[in-house]
């Protein structure tokens, strides 16, 4: 039996309905990954939205304390949607050069904490820009730039990339719960893509 650790924002964790953030509620892909890998892997994840890269860097220490880190075979990880968020017309929450640095630090911490794990990084998913509020925005052009930055700094380290951006960009609006999150069907499709990468990591180990 393999051991898998999922790190990610509300695309993984799920989201409750919140009109202030135009969120309709989403199960996240994490629950489906756990179901799909039942019998072949124990799937662990923080009971927390892992948010932006610096938040993940800080809380990896706490999340790892609940596990036996040396026994984790695969870490599937994402940060990005919080990092590209623009509030009240401001620049992205995390400047892209800082994002690159934070991803490298998160990678180093994952490598230290989970020394035997294969690391997979999931690219951030696409959004429906026209459904967003003008004072709380994400742009696919930003997401694409940050995804490219992630590949630029992580691929040379041997990190496997899971292109959930391309998967989600092909979705029609019926698979979305809101402008950012996905409904049951959309989350399940993402989960299948996550499981495919995780299973490939078993073979490569």
For each feature predicted by the language model, list its residue ranges.
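Histidine-centered active-site loop/cap adjacent to the catalytic His
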Residues: 176-205
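Surface-exposed, active-site-proximal loop segments in enzymatic domains
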Residues: 84-94, 128-135, 174-176
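Hydrophobic positions in alpha-helices of CheY-like receiver
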Residues: 106-110
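Short, well-ordered beta-to-alpha junction loops that form the rim of enzyme active sites
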Residues: 79, 123-125, 164-166
């Amino acid at each position: 039996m393999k051991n898998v650790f999922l790190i990610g924002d509300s695309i993984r964790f799920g989201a409750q309905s919140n009109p202030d953030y135009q969120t309709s509620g989403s199960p996240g892909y994490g629950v489906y990954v756990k179901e799909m890998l039942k019998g072949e892997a124990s799937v662990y994840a923080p009971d927390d939205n892992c948010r932006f890269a610096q938040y993940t860097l800080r809380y990896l220490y706490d999340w790892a304390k609940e596990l036996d880190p040396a026994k984790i075979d695969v870490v599937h990880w994402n940060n990005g949607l919080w990092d590209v968020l623009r509030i009240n017309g401001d620049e992205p929450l995390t400047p892209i050069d800082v994002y690159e640095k934070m991803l490298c630090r998160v990678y180093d911490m994952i490598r230290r904490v989970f020394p035997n794990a294969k690391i997979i990084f999931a690219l951030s998913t696409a959004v429906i820009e026209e459904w967003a509020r003008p004072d709380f925005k994400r742009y696919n052009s930003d997401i694409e730039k940050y995804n490219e930055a992630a590949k630029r700094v992580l691929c040379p380290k041997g990190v496997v990339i899971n292109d959930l951006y391309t998967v989600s960009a092909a979705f029609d609006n019926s698979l979305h719960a809101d402008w950012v999150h996905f409904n049951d069907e959309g989350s399940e499709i993402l989960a299948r893509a996550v499981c495919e990468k995780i299973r490939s990591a078993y073979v490569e180990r």
